[in-house]
Curated annotation (Swiss-Prot):
The gene is IL2RA. Residues 91-118, 188-213 are annotated as: Disordered. PROSITE patterns: SUSHI (PS50923). Residues 22-243 are extracellular. This is Interleukin-2 receptor subunit alpha. It is a single-pass type I membrane protein. It comes from the Eukaryota.
Amino acid sequence: MEPSLLLWGILTFVVVHGHVTELCDENPPDIQHATFKALTYKTGTMLNCECKKGFRRISNGSAFMLCAGNSSHSSWENQCRCISTSPRATDGQIIPKPEEQKGKSPMGMQSQMQPTDQVNLPGHCREPPPWEHEDSRRIYHFVVGQTVHYQCMQGFRALKRGPAKSVCKTTCGKATWTQPRLQCLSERSDGWFPDDEEPQASTDAALGSDTSCPSITASTTDFQRHTEVAMTTESFVFTTEYQIAVAGCVLLLISIVLLSGLTWQRRWRKSRRTI
């Protein structure tokens, strides 16, 4: 991985025209036999400039495209450019092969078709335009507030138990995705796949935990445990110091008594000799 991409990947916030936008920590959840797509992209969303095998980004080219703008107009900044890795190719020479792009969708899991009621949503960008020699799969980095929609793969039909979408939200101080309520059945079978009931249980569990903050509870419990351990240690130290102090006082008292006894004995002997 290139240093610029590594540094950029470590960041969890991105600045877009004076506004700080929080990136989602993870990718949208995977649903068995289903794919997801974003109809539009919130400002702050980033798309990696990936090239297909045999090509690479130009040395002075951008590592990603950025959806930037305001509530009235948003668009994709930067341009992705790929060149051949052949020794005869240079950074200033782009080798166009438009015939390779025909009939091929560069979206991977996402579709480029946009509904008419979503393309001009304020504060959002349309699907980024394709570039020459683009990789077959696009890698997005979404921001809080982004919504992705799910649909079953070809050969499967949807059994909706709720909204077939996922939204990136901030929960318990962490940007996470909500769990979509969607399950996909095979069109050639009236029954479930053997492994389809487990995802359903996990879906219900995930939905029930959206409003809870187990991490905070765990942190509080750990803090209480550390506090109790600290108090116990302090009590032990205090008890030990107290015992040492008492023993020292007893030794000092015994020493004083012995010295007093010796002094009195010497004086008594002197007075007896005088008599």
